Structure formats: C-alpha cells, structure tokens
A protein has these predicted regions:
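Active-site and NAD+-binding cores of ADP-ribose-processing enzymes
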Residues: 2-31, 39, 52-202
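Active-site rim elements
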Residues: 35
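Short amphipathic alpha-helices within nucleic acid-binding modules
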Residues: 43-49
Length: 202
C-alpha cells in the first residue's frame, strides 16, 4: 500500500521548498486553520493560484504537484467529522485535561476550542469552539503537529464531505515538490487546459 499521495498547491510565487514562514501571503485567508494549503483537485489549485495572484498584484499563476504523507484515521482532524479517539487521547494526555464531548463532534470545533484553551481563554465552551483568532490558530497547529497530527482537512464541497478534499499541512517537511506548472485561468477563474506549461525552477 502506498505511503504517500499526490496533491496540488496553487500560488503566484516560485520557490523550491515550502515554508511556513510565508503563511498568509497567498490569498491571505486561513479559514480552515493554519498550515500550507493543498487540494486533491488540480482545477481548484489553479483557482487558488488565480486568487493569490489577484490579492498580491501578480500576473503569474503556478500549480505545484506535491507528494504528501498518506491520510490515516489518526493523523488528521476533519472539519465536519468526529475527531478520532486516538487523536483525542494524545491531546488529552499532553494538556492534562479532558476535552468536552460537544467539542469532539467536529474537527473545526475541536481545533478552535483547543486553540483558545492553549492561549488561556476562559470563556464558555460554546464561545471557545465558535471562533479562534490568529494566535489561537497558530498555537493549535503547532500543538497538533507535536502530537502527530499531519493535516487539518475539509471537503472541497460542504455538500459532499466524502468527495475532493483540501488540507492544511502542519509540517513543511512533509511536502515534496514533484513539478511546477504555469497555468492561466479564464475570466471565471476556470483553468484553461491548453495553458498548462511545466517550468524548471531551482
């Protein structure tokens, strides 16, 4: 069984290694948590590249084909699914307290609650699982990485949680670049298939 998967990353920048130090320089949003965003859909990566280019005043769009670790039951948190018991156990062991049951029902609640807990927030559970600021998102990503979580994951379409997925990779060293392609999109941000051109960058 393969130990890796192929995913895609859309950007307006050229580089030969991923780095967490550049977080927020793409489209500037981290709605699903902090990490390096990748997707199982090439066309979605092209869309993200276009959005990043517009946000940064750039003309060029690039899609990186990357190799990443295989998604397993206990190495990720999925936004709209219950959190794996092994992940919960590792987290509770490290923080020394029990996570409330209502927080375990969905990865997005778990992530936000834990982030707020790590930054010392002392408010109602409902508030802690509802919103998390940038500091909380940063702390929770670092913490989850330390207990063996590789990904924050969410569905490409909220109506189809078992279809294409997007992920935030928590450790830059888990991403291997296989190739870089320059792409163009039309006025509706749809990939122009004939525009795809592999480029060499060192």
């Amino acid at each position: 069984m393969p130990q890796t998967e192929i995913f895609y990353h859309g950007t307006c920048r050229l580089f030969d290694k991923f780095s967490l130090s550049f977080l927020g320089e793409g489209e500037g949003k981290s709605k699903f948590g902090q990490g390096i965003y990748i997707t199982s859909s090439y066309k979605t990566a092209a869309l993200y590249a276009s959005k990043a280019a517009k946000a940064n005043g750039k003309d060029c769009c690039y899609v990186y084909t990357v190799e990443v670790p295989l998604l397993t039951d206990d190495n990720h948190i999925f936004s709209c699914k219950s959190v794996n018991e092994d992940v919960i156990s590792r987290v509770e062991h490290k923080i020394g307290e029990v996570i409330p049951d209502e927080v375990k029902n969905a990865g997005k609640y778990f992530r936000k609650y834990l982030g707020n807990l790590l930054t010392g927030q002392k408010v109602a559970i409902k508030k802690m699982m509802d919103k998390a600021d940038a500091e909380a998102e940063s702390k929770v990503s670092e913490f989850l990485k330390s207990v063996g979580v590789v990904y924050l994951a969410w569905p490409h379409s909220q109506n189809n949680p078992d279809g294409d997925t997007n992920r935030a990779v928590l450790n830059e060293d888990d991403i291997k670049i296989l190739k870089i392609e320059q792409v163009e999109v039309d006025e509706k941000n749809k990939l122009i298939e004939s525009s795809v051109k592999e480029i060499q960058y060192k």
